[in-house]
């Protein structure tokens, strides 16, 4: 269903960091370059996967969700709202506690109001820590989360809301495709 994405995952390098096998991929790391055909295939797949009915914003987290959200935006004319790693101190700014399997930090939401119908897209979900923080903050604002989609699902993340993905992978000394959405 996603031949360019699947081939790029099957051929991407694996880097060992301590006990962790880390896959290095254009969509998750920007290394090597992000091929336009890959990005187009992903955007088309995500548009088919997501409920975009009456959505005000495509929301994504800085940094690697940005190319995905932008490609979807260009195809749908739905504006992108980026959850940033920098605090701007603007009125209505909302903090997000970001906890991943390997780090902890803060992110910041701006420009989303009560009643805004949004979809969230991102490159990869592993543990669900970052996304659960984003969901909690968006719900506290009063945003309506219409849908959540990821390009890649890795492992068995624990997420507070239903979500979809294009491909599910397992990473050992190589990437193995578990399944794909259709």
From Swiss-Prot:
GO terms for cellular component: cytoplasm. GO terms for molecular function: guanine phosphoribosyltransferase activity; hypoxanthine phosphoribosyltransferase activity. CDD domains: PRTases_typeI (cd06223). The keyword ATP-binding does not apply. Keywords: Cytoplasm, Glycosyltransferase, Purine salvage, Transferase. PROSITE patterns: PUR_PYR_PR_TRANSFER. It catalyses: IMP + diphosphate = hypoxanthine + 5-phospho-alpha-D-ribose 1-diphosphate; GMP + diphosphate = guanine + 5-phospho-alpha-D-ribose 1-diphosphate. GO terms for biological process: IMP salvage; purine ribonucleoside salvage. Pfam families: Pribosyltran (PF00156). Its EC number is 2.4.2.8. Pathway: Purine metabolism; IMP biosynthesis via salvage pathway; IMP from hypoxanthine: step 1/1. InterPro entries: HGPRTase-like, PRibTrfase_dom, PRTase-like, Pur/Pyrimidine_PRTase. It is an enzyme of class 2 (transferase). It is found in: Cytoplasm. Catalyzes a salvage reaction resulting in the formation of IMP that is energically less costly than de novo synthesis. NCBIfam families: HPT_Archaea, PRK02304.1-4. Homodimer. Belongs to the purine/pyrimidine phosphoribosyltransferase family. Archaeal HPRT subfamily. HAMAP family: Hypx_phosphoribosyltr. This is Hypoxanthine/guanine phosphoribosyltransferase. It comes from Methanospirillum hungatei JF-1 (strain ATCC 27890 / DSM 864 / NBRC 100397 / JF-1). The gene is hpt.
């Amino acid at each position: 269903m996603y031949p360019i994405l699947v081939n790029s995952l099957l051929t991407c390098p694996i880097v060992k960091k301590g006990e962790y096998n880390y896959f290095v991929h254009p969509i998750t790391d920007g290394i090597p370059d992000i091929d336009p055909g890959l990005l187009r295939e992903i955007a088309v797949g995500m548009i088919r996967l997501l409920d975009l009915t009456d959505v005000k914003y495509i929301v994504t987290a800085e940094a690697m969700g940005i190319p995905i959200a932008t490609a979807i935006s260009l195809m749908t004319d739905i504006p992108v709202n980026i959850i940033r790693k920098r605090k701007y101190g603007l009125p209505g700014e909302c903090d997000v506690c970001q906890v991943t399997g390997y780090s902890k930090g803060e992110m910041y939401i701006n420009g989303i109001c009560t009643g805004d119908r949004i979809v969230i897209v991102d490159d990869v979900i592993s543990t669900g820590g970052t996304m659960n923080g984003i969901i909690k903050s968006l719900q506290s604002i009063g945003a309506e989360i219409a849908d959540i989609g990821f390009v890649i699902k890795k492992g068995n993340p624990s997420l507070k809301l239903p979500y979809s993905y294009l491909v599910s992978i397992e990473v050992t000394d190589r990437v193995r495709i578990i399944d794909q959405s259709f």
